[in-house]
Each structure stands twice: as C-alpha cells, then as structure tokens.
C-alpha cells in the first residue's frame, strides 16, 4: 500500500495531529495489516460502514475508488450495496449506487 498523505495534504496546517493520526495510524498502521485483513476486505467493510452511517461524500467516493483499485468489481460492488441496503437503509443505498456508478462508469459491461 502506498504511503497515505491526504491528511497532511488537506489538513496538515489546520489540524496537524489529526492529519498525523489519519496518515500514520489509520492508513500507516491499521490499513497496512494485510496479514490480518486484506485491503480488498478493508475496503468492503469501510464502504458498508460509511453507507450505514449515511456518509455519502467525497471520502466515500475515495473509498469506492480504493475498493475498485483493491479488486472489487462493478458486479461485486452492486451486490455489496444491494445486500447492505437491507441493513443500512434504502435511501443510503440509492446515494451509494449513484456514487459507485460514477466510479465504475468506464468499466466494460459484464459478459453474460
């Protein structure tokens, strides 16, 4: 996993400690424990948590792009959102589907 610098890039001057915790602890330590949980699975969990909390903003879009880069296909993403909709709420699912459609827009259609 490449070194995360988003915290420092976006908040470093305003909230240096938060930026440090974001980049060094959350992404530097937690996300890097691939022997415990793969990046793909961490992406899946993160998206479901964001969806469940109704957090549909640029940070969710980042995590959907991250999930795609970590190997979650368009079809899998659709199934993840559909499954989570019954637990996280239908309106949340609609919002996440629209964001996922943007991220996966240039993918080839699935072959039947």
Give residue ranges: language-model regions.
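Aromatic-enriched hydrophobic runs in primary sequence
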Residues: 2, 47, 61-62, 75, ...
